[in-house]
Regions:
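Bacterial N-terminal signal peptides
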Residues: 18-29
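Generic recognition of cysteine residues
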Residues: 15, 20, 110-113
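N-terminal secretory signal peptides that target proteins for export/translocation
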Residues: 1-15
């Protein structure tokens, strides 16, 4: 009996030892695989209330606007730029109504440690970007690379990683956005609490304000069943220094400026928000929200995580 007990105890010890060895082996294997993930921290500036990073195009440093409101990446061609232009040329109209030829170009692109050949739509270097940036990095780049990015204006950096678990321990608020069927851009919901909500709001870091409502969405809120609640949110609008009701304050292009007492976006409440309504194709949540916290974007999973400042 004692012999059997000793064997049983010894067997349990060996089983535990074997289990520990298996765990160590699996952990080591995972660590090796995990170490193959790429991560880089890239300096980011917040210019004109928009996120800007530097990248290399064919070895030449260029400044790119990180724009979630653009489905394509765009390169502005300057004098002396030497790129291999490919594809059919497209005639388009610039900001001054002049017609220009454009198309797309292939270039060696390097953002931190992430490099490879990438297609860019090219445009003549004109006033489309007001001469402020050399190009745009759109949602196509995030989806094509399969990376997760963290835009952190407070710390002044952009973290780009293929490690999907890198930010798991950070306290964050998750929003699953809807991908537009036409341009695949991120659309989400914004609440005016109280006072209703607006669906299909474009999350657009290439828009340097906080909130822009389509005039149709604005009018619908004003005349909805909760229209009175929404109107109470409007703490008085000012256009050209005048006070009055929101519907009265319009300029020649149909813009209405107003201020919201409270708004909920990316699962976060924000207060005293300057906003406006305008005749435009989409309601937009803009890059000004990056002043209130960092944003993590996982484009392939259609997730946006918001990390409010101070939490």
């Amino acid at each position: 009996m004692k012999f059997i007990i000793m064997i049983t105890v010894g067997g349990r010890f060996l089983c535990r030892l074997w289990a520990c060895l298996v765990i160590i082996i699996l952990h080591s294997t995972f660590s090796i695989l995990h170490s193959k993930e790429l991560t880089d921290t890239i300096p980011l500036t917040f210019e004109y209330n928009m996120p800007v990073v530097k990248a290399l195009i064919n070895g030449q440093e260029r400044r790119f606007l990180l724009d979630t409101g653009s489905s394509a990446s765009i390169l502005m061609l300057g004098t002396g730029d030497d790129y291999v232009l490919t594809g059919d040329s497209i005639e388009m109209e610039d900001a001054y109504g002049e017609r220009e030829m454009t198309g797309y170009t292939q270039a060696d692109f390097c953002l931190g440690c992430f490099e490879g050949e990438k297609n860019f739509y090219f445009m003549p270097y004109n006033e489309v970007l007001h001469g402020l940036f050399d190009g745009i990095l759109g949602m196509d780049y995030l989806e094509y690379m399969g990376v997760v990015v963290k835009i952190d204006v407070k710390r002044g950096h952009l973290i780009v990683t293929t490690d999907k678990r890198l930010f798991n321990r950070e306290k964050r608020k998750k929003t699953t956005y809807k991908r537009d069927k036409t341009d695949r851009l991120p659309k989400l919901k914004v609440k005016m609490s109280p006072g209703g909500k607006v669906k299909n709001v474009l999350f657009d870091t290439g828009f340097n304000e906080m909130l822009e409502l389509r005039m149709e969405d604005f009018e619908r809120l004003m005349h909805s069943r909760r229209g009175e609640d929404f109107r109470q949110q409007l703490t008085g609008t000012a256009y050209g220094g005048n006070q009055g009701t929101a519907l009265q304050q319009r300029d020649s292009v149909g813009r209405t400026n107003f201020r919201l007492k409270e708004m909920k976006a990316l699962k976060t409440k924000l207060y005293d928000i300057d906003a406006h309504a305008e005749v435009t194709s989409d309601s937009k949540l803009g890059a000004a929200i990056l002043n209130h916290g960092a944003v993590i974007i996982h484009a392939r999973k259609r997730k946006i995580y918001f990390l409010p400042n101070g939490e």
